């Protein structure tokens, strides 16, 4: 579980150019997008409470990201484009 988290975090960090701290704590829009990407890919293999434990984000924040990812991605080409690159690197 921890290995998967670190792998996803590393790939998201590499594709977005933000550090772990920035991804998890910064309020800038691009960092928020990176956080959405991180939680989106983690949620494919981990339950909400596991994501909360690994990231230190609140359960409410994780739920909001999981439930709001599709709407955010629908309107942001950069988010969709980065997600495709990350998905290819993580899952082939």
Question: What label would you give each PLM region?
Answer:
Residues 43, 66-67, 73:
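DNA major-groove recognition helix of helix-turn-helix
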Residues 50-55:
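Short alpha-helical "recognition helix" segments of helix-turn-helix
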Residues 34, 45-49:
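Residue-level signal for the short linker/turn that defines the boundary of a DNA-recognition helix
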Residues 72-92:
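Short Lys/Arg-enriched helix C-cap and helix-to-coil transition segments
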Residues 1-19, 83-89:
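Conserved alpha/beta core segments of nucleic-acid transaction machinery
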Residues 10-36:
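Short, Lys/Arg-enriched anionic-surface-contact patches
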